[in-house]
């Protein structure tokens, strides 16, 4: 019998911190289900959610400012364990009768915390056992200057006298540092202490249990109806295809639109994996000529994106209309999409962006929605993919933009540009694998520059195209550093591209960080 993997769960109230989703991912890694909600979500829904504990996240606001987001009273009336992190600790302190003050300057970076009182949260945890000190990561401006009545100061640093506090009889805890980031060495142990030991959650959130749970849900939801899925070859849609095939077999039909803007050989790879090896029913639509015709004479990046997205919708809708038995549309929506679209009932919560999966499929498509990954973060999706038997290389490959090479060809998109770029990109990726560098960078790709540069071919001058290489290192893709790849490696890649691809005379390497640049060129 499938265990109820949602029975023991944690609720994270988001005050707008950049690390909030990381808190959720760390708790999921422990094996406990959790959700992220805006801090001002309705009291009725928060209490009816059935959480075994609540975490108050960090946030960019100041508790000393009028109208700053505040910890809701009903949270403290719930008798649940509460863990405030950074701003979460500050708003807890203010709400319960303590005080905060603004520091002379922000504290950002590594810090050493002295454990003063080893309460249930800190007991037995130390990076320097003889001194009861923890190496942590700080990122704050304000700090707690007076703890509320009934609270004990549990940790301090050289700069702030109250780095952590607790009220054990209520199971209320607060830390000024960030246990969710890897720089806090005992961070995962602290989160486990709260979630498992203090809240009493069982660790049921595992890949095997998630697969079993989703198979049961999908079968119950769709019955014997047919389901269609837009298969892109990306991680999310590939995992959805593998999961649904395991759940409903031949009831699933995947529609793979070959746009002519994919990675080199990707169309054949997708067909080989899903149709030939896994037995999934895949309809391949070769639409390259339609895409190149539609993009002719278009130079604006946003216009290109819209054309590519709208044409995908049109082609997908054409194919879906042929399948009269299809009652359900499957999509690869994942949990960050849900969080970012959630917004707030009061409009005060931190909203990052609005999400539209698959470019926003037409509302007139009267199909039910199946989104088996909507509770999962990207790292969980990858683990599910491996557990479902997808190749590691497919599941863990670098991100690829929805419009494909259409936004890696600057300016007008032409078939000959796409072919050159796909081959150059393939050489770059192949050499990264050969040098054991692929998994050491977060994303790497080539860009086609529509400018000609002088070169020498034999004894004659030639004006040929330029290829730019881009590789970045990042944790969250919100910020990124350019990857300092070895010179010898870059020389090898450049030589291969110039020697193997007729029409390219120059290769350059992009050394721009994000910000100010974005990761993609368009």
Swiss-Prot record:
GO CC annotation: cytosol
Name of the molecule in the record: GMP synthase [glutamine-hydrolyzing]
Residues binding ATP, per UniProt: 232-238
E.C. number: 6.3.5.2
Highest taxon listed in the record's lineage: Bacteria
Pathway: Purine metabolism; GMP biosynthesis; GMP from XMP (L-Gln route): step 1/1
UniProt domain GMPS ATP-PPase: residue ranges: 205-397
Enzyme class, first EC level, given as a word: ligase
Keywords: ATP-binding, Glutamine amidotransferase, GMP biosynthesis, Ligase, Nucleotide-binding, Purine biosynthesis
Swiss-Prot/TrEMBL catalytic activity: XMP + L-glutamine + ATP + H2O = GMP + L-glutamate + AMP + diphosphate + 2 H(+)
InterPro entries: Class_I_gatase-like, GATASE, GMP_synth_C, GMP_synth_GATase, GMP_synthase, GMPS_ATP_PPase_dom, NAD/GMP_synthase, Rossmann-like_a/b/a_fold
Task performed by this protein: Catalyzes the synthesis of GMP from XMP.
């Amino acid at each position: 019998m499938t265990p109820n993997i949602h029975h023991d769960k944690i609720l994270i109230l988001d005050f707008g911190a950049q690390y909030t989703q990381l808190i959720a991912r760390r708790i999921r890694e422990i094996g406990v289900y959790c959700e992220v909600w805006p801090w001002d979500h309705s009291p009725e829904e928060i209490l009816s959610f059935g959480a075994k504990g609540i975490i108050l996240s960090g946030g960019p606001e100041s508790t000393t400012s009028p109208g700053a987001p505040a910890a809701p009273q009903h949270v403290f009336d719930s008798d649940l364990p509460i863990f405030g992190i950074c701003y979460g600790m500050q708003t807890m302190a203010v709400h319960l009768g303590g005080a905060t003050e603004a520091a002379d300057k922000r504290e950002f970076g590594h810090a050493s915390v002295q454990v003063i009182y080893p309460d249930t949260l800190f007991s037995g945890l130390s990076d320097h056992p003889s001194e009861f000190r923890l190496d942590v990561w700080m990122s704050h401006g304000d700090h707690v200057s007076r703890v509320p009545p009934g609270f004990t100061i549990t940790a301090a640093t050289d700069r702030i006298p109250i780095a952590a506090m607790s009220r054990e009889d209520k199971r209320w805890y607060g830390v000024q540092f960030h246990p969710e980031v890897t720089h806090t060495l005992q961070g995962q142990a602290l989160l486990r202490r709260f979630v498992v030991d203090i809240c009493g959650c069982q660790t049921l959130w595992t890949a095997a249990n998630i697969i079993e749970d989703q198979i049961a849900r999908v079968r119950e939801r769709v019955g014997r109806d047919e389901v269609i899925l837009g298969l892109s070859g990306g991680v999310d849609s590939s995992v959805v295809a593998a999961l649904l095939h395991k759940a409903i077999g031949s009831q699933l039909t995947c529609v793979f639109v070959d746009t002519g803007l994919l990675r080199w050989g990707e169309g054949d790879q997708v067909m080989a994996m899903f149709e030939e090896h896994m037995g999934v029913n895949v309809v391949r639509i070769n639409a390259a000529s339609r895409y190149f015709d539609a993009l002719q004479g278009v130079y604006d990046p946003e216009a290109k994106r819209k054309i590519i997205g709208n044409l995908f919708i049109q082609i997908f809708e054409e194919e879906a209309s042929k399948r009269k038995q299809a009652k359900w549309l499957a999509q690869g929506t994942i949990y960050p999409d849900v969080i970012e679209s959630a917004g707030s009932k009061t409009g005060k919560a931190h909203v990052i962006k609005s999400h539209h999966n698959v470019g926003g499929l037409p509302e007139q498509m009267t199909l039910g929605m199946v989104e088996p990954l909507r509770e999962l973060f990207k790292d969980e999706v990858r683990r599910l993919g491996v557990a479902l038997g997808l190749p590691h290389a497919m599941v863990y490959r670098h991100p690829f933009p929805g419009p494909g090479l259409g936004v890696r060809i600057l300016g007008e998109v032409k078939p000959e540009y796409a072919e050159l770029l796909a081959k150059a990109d393939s050489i770059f990726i192949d050499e990264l694998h050969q040098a054991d560098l692929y998994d050491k960078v977060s994303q790497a790709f080539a860009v086609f520059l529509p400018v000609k540069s002088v070169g020498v071919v034999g004894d004659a001058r030639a004006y040929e195209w330029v290829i730019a290489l881009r590789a970045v290192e990042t944790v969250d893709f919100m910020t990124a550093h350019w990857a300092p790849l070895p010179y010898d490696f870059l020389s090898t890649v450049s030589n291969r591209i110039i020697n193997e691809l007729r029409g390219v005379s120059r290769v350059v390497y992009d050394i721009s960080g994000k910000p100010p640049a974005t990761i993609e060129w368009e």
